[in-house]
C-alpha cells in the first residue's frame, strides 16, 4: 500500500488567556467555533465542506458531549461536514492532527481540520458526594 504525504497548510487560534479572564463566559464550543470561523475567513472556506473536522478536548463539560460537531454547525463551514471529538488526559489536539494526517496518508480524506478546545473557566468541577447532596437539597428549597 502506498501512502501519501499529509501537510499542514495553515492554522488559526484564539489567543491564550487566564481562566476567569476575557473568555470567562465562553464555553469550549464558543472558543472552537471562533477558531473555526477564523480559519474559514483566512482560507476562504465559507460554505465549504472539508472531509472531516476533528478536535480534542481534555476538560469536556457534559453539555459538550458532541463538541466538534456543534462547533461545525455553529461555524461558517458547510453543516454537512463530518466532525468528531477525541478525548484523553492530554495532547488531544496533537492526537487530532495525527488522526486526520493518517486519514489523508491512507487516502481516506483530502482536506481535514484538526485542533483542540478547552476552557479552564468552564471546566466541570467534581465535588464530594456529601457536597453534591447538600447542593441538590439546597436547590429544592423554597424561597
What does each model-found stretch correspond to?
Residues 57-63:
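Glycine-rich phosphate-binding loops at beta-strand->alpha-helix junctions
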Residues 49-56, 113:
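Short glycine-rich phosphate-binding loop at a beta-alpha junction
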Residues 1-6, 18-47, 64-65, 69-143:
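Acyl-thioester C-C bond-transforming condensing/cleaving domain
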Residues 11-15:
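Short polar catalytic/cofactor-binding loops
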Amino acid at each position: 500500500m502506498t501512502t501519501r504525504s499529509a501537510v499542514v497548510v495553515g492554522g488559526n487560534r484564539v489567543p491564550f488567556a487566564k481562566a476567569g479572564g476575557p473568555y470567562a463566559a465562553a464555553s469550549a464550543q464558543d472558543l472552537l467555533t471562533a477558531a473555526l470561523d477564523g480559519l474559514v475567513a483566512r482560507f476562504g472556506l465559507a460554505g465549504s465542506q472539508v472531509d472531516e473536522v476533528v478536535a480534542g478536548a481534555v476538560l469536556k463539560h457534559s453539555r459538550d458531549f458532541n463538541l466538534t460537531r456543534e462547533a461545525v454547525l455553529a461555524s461558517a463551514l458547510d453543516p454537512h461536514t463530518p466532525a468528531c471529538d477525541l478525548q484523553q488526559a492530554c495532547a488531544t489536539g496533537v492526537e487530532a492532527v495525527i488522526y486526520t494526517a493518517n486519514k489523508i496518508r491512507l487516502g481516506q480524506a483530502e482536506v481535514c481540520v484538526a485542533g483542540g478546545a478547552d476552557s479552564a473557566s468552564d471546566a466541570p468541577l467534581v465535588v464530594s458526594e456529601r457536597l453534591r447532596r447538600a447542593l441538590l437539597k439546597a436547590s429544592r428549597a423554597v424561597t
